Amino acid sequence: GAEAVGRCMRLFDGARVPLAAIDIPELAQRNVAALFEEANRGLAFLSLGEADSLLTITYGGELYLARRIEVSARTLAEAEGERRQVLVERLVLELQRTLDNFDRQYNFISVVRLVLASEQPADWLLAALGENLYVPVQAMDLAAVADFPALPELKNPQRQAQGLLAIGAALREGGP
């Protein structure tokens, strides 16, 4: 955590490269999730990365929960048959447990849906999550909430997911 950030800052200081800010993935994802929030409603946002997954729950633009899940987009895409089914069941169970615990701890926040961002094609996963979770599940589509005319490649959901952290960092308020 703080030690890793400190090491990174010292490297930049040593190279005389000024840093205006350092973002962490959880806050970058929060910034993107805020684009999909509904007023007075909580939003679960699951990003499937190449190494693992990050689940965040936001409300009013604030991050209330962040959790890493050891299931990656690549692992799911490469798995077949029974192995894929086991991974999906594990992911569903982790999501259900987290949503249930969140509901108990923050009963004043109603999580109304889960947005899924995946670096791999995941229509089949979207359907599986939708069948097994008690909240509606939708694919992240930044084109529905933002306009990127200078970046036509961001019309592709997988490219959006690949650039999720950079996009989230660019959306940070309060400075560079």
Language model: regions and residue ranges:
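Hydrophobic/aromatic-enriched cytosolic interaction surfaces used to assemble or bind macromolecules
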Residues: 1-176
